[in-house]
């Protein structure tokens, strides 16, 4: 799937796409009787949020895309270290999985590195749901969904793009490009933020989003 997407060739079938996951959100909103919502997502979640806004604009009060990209592979510009860490295969045992999580520090916020917290989060993730094939399916969904260039250029919803200046997995350029494509988008670049949202930055991120959504 990845090779076909990068070469812009016909794609083999995939279990689901970003559109399917965006449709899941619509289903949840219907169940909750919500006609509109502020749609926020980070990383792959930002891609799903973009697709939601594109395909369901009347249900979108605003779009908040965090450390994400517009479906243009050339904007990702991952460092070799970050990509190596992302593609590394974790051990299947709990202890090995937890220690392996430290490799992801390659693309996380260096200033706020916290190995103990990384281990605790990995332990929680393993205990909640260790399902490696899910990661493969998620990657397939991303690449199978293609470019959103023209669709984002035609988007007419209030949009906030947030991106870390130190992100080495999805480059700051990807955030800048996303904001450039969407008419009227607001771009906020965050100092010392990698491809994660460490606790010391929570206040700044929440305040930024709150100020934006309260105006909409």
Question: In which residue ranges do the predicted regions lie?
Answer:
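Short beta-strand/loop motif that positions the catalytic acidic residue
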Residues: 155, 161-163
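Conserved acidic catalytic loop of the alpha/beta-hydrolase fold
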Residues: 19-37
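Conserved hydrolase catalytic core segment
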Residues: 35-74
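Catalytic active-site module of serine/aspartate enzymes centered on a nucleophile-bearing elbow/loop
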Residues: 185-216
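Active-site nucleophile elbow and catalytic-triad environment of alpha/beta-hydrolase enzymes
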Residues: 135-151
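Flexible "cap/lid" loop of the alpha/beta hydrolase fold
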Residues: 63-92
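Conserved alpha/beta-hydrolase catalytic His-Asp/Glu region
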Residues: 96-137
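Acidic catalytic loop of the alpha/beta-hydrolase fold
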Residues: 166-170
């Amino acid at each position: 799937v990845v090779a076909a997407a990068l070469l812009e060739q016909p794609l083999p079938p995939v279990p689901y796409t970003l559109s399917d996951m965006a449709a899941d959100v619509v289903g949840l909103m219907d169940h909750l009787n919500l006609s509109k919502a502020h749609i926020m997502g980070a990383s792959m979640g930002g891609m799903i949020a973009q697709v939601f806004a594109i395909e369901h604009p009347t249900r979108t009060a605003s779009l908040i895309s965090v450390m994400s990209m517009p479906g243009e592979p050339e904007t990702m510009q991952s460092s070799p270290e970050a990509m190596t860490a992302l593609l590394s295969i974790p051990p299947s045992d709990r202890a090995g999985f937890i220690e392996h999580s430290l490799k992801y520090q390659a693309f996380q916020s260096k200033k706020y590195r916290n190995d103990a917290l990384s281990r605790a989060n990995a332990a929680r993730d393993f205990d909640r749901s260790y399902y490696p094939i899910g990661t493969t399916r998620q990657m397939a969904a991303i690449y199978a969904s293609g470019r959103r260039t023209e669709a984002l250029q035609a988007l007419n919803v209030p949009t906030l793009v947030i991106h870390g200046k130190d992100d080495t997995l999805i480059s700051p350029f990807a955030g800048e490009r996303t904001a450039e494509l969407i008419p009227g988008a607001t771009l906020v670049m965050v100092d010392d933020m990698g491809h994660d949202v460490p606790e010391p930055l929570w206040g700044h991120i929440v305040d930024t989003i709150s100020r934006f959504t309260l105006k909409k």
